[in-house]
Amino acid sequence: MRVKTGIIRRKRHKRVLKAAKGFRGASGDAFKQAKQATRRAMAFATRDRKVNKRRMRQLWITRINSAARMNGVSYSVLMNGLKKAGILLDRKVLADIALNNATEFTKLVEAAKSAL
């Protein structure tokens, strides 16, 4: 007896179309286009999770550099001074302090300068 793929196919199509919900045009309605669009979307999502980490680090460095230059020191000199002073704060925390707590950041810069 021949086995038909009715239930399995419907389940597979339903899963793909559910993942393609909200896509424009045939990409959200037609199975073949939805399958291609979701595969592409998943590839972009995988790539962009890594890109996002790079962009955030870049943003933190830009913020730290900007705040450091307002205090008369460059980013590289600040980071070297902090390392020599034994202040182990990562870039995410430093950027947050620079953005929200300028007086505390100034104290960190002074500590870095004195360690050099």
UniProtKB/Swiss-Prot annotation:
Pfam families, A to Z: Ribosomal_L20
Q: Which GO terms describe its cellular component?
A: cytosolic large ribosomal subunit
Alphabetically list the UniProt keywords: Ribonucleoprotein, Ribosomal protein, RNA-binding, rRNA-binding
Q: Which Gene3D superfamilies match?
A: 6.10.160.10, Ribosomal protein L20
Family matches, as InterPro entries: Ribosomal_bL20, RIBOSOMAL_L20_CS, Ribosomal_protein_bL20_C
The highest taxon in the source lineage is Bacteria
- Listed GO biological process terms: ribosomal large subunit assembly; translation
Give the GO molecular function terms: rRNA binding; structural constituent of ribosome
Name the family the entry cites.
Answer: Belongs to the bacterial ribosomal protein bL20 family.
State what this protein does: Binds directly to 23S ribosomal RNA and is necessary for the in vitro assembly process of the 50S ribosomal subunit. It is not involved in the protein synthesizing functions of that subunit.
Could you identify this protein by its name? Large ribosomal subunit protein bL20
Question: Which organism does this sequence originate in?
Answer: Fusobacterium nucleatum subsp. nucleatum (strain ATCC 25586 / DSM 15643 / BCRC 10681 / CIP 101130 / JCM 8532 / KCTC 2640 / LMG 13131 / VPI 4355)
The gene behind this protein is rplT
